[in-house]
């Protein structure tokens, strides 16, 4: 969104920036796209073919078919919005259905289905630290998690400790590195957060 806010010059900047990223560092595009299949097909081409990013976030609330154009890409990943960091997560994602399940568990079902169908693309979920808890993690399948909410949003890493999950989480810190502790370099701030994460998760 920050690139799109600048219009075409911003998108050009993004396109020029991506090739400069170190090849051993995965690039996750937080696009949160979710549209009908024909439109999603072109989003998949834009992100995985033209931009060649490693992973993208998707909004799954239109149904499983919005995933399908992204699922034939070996070496790529998608993360489905399950429990996001915003307060409004309780308005939809955490609502209880008539059968007692939560809406976010339907997202988990999509991940389970993609695994059962041997998707070439790895499929995981977005679970924000500000709303995460042991029950949510228990309710969701043991698949990779993209975990925002640490840093500026004040998420608590203890929400990820304990339990029996094996799939690795990818823990994101953005504004906590970009804008906090101006006396430190970006590298120093990144190392500081990496150390906190390692210590909290006993890595």
What are these regions (language model features)?
Residues 31, 35-126:
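Conserved anion-binding
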Residues 125, 129-172, 176-177:
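A C-terminal functional module that forms or caps the active site or interfaces directly
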Residues 160-168, 177-203:
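C-terminal helical cap(s) of enzyme catalytic domains, especially alpha/beta-barrels
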């Amino acid at each position: 969104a920050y690139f799109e806010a600048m219009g075409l010059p911003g998108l050009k900047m993004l396109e020029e920036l991506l090739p400069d990223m170190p090849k051993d560092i995965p690039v996750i595009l937080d696009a949160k796209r979710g549209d009908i299949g024909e439109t999603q097909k072109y989003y998949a081409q834009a992100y995985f073919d033209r931009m060649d990013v490693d992973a993208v976030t998707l909004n799954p609330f239109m149904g499983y078919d919005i995933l399908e154009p992204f699922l034939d890409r070996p070496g790529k990943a998608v993360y489905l919005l399950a429990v996001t960091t915003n307060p409004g997560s309780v308005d939809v994602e955490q609502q209880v259905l008539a059968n007692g399940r939560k809406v976010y568990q339907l997202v988990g079902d999509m991940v389970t289905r993609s695994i059962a169908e041997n998707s070439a693309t790895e499929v995981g979920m977005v679970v924000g630290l500000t709303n995460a808890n042991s029950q949510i993690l228990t309710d969701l399948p043991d698949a990779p998690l993209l975990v925002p909410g640490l840093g500026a949003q004040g998420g608590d890493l203890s929400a990820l400790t304990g339990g029996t999950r094996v799939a690795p989480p990818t823990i994101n810190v953005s504004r906590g590195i970009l804008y906090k502790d101006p006396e430190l370099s970006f590298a120093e701030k990144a190392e500081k957060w990496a150390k906190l994460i390692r210590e909290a998760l006993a890595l």
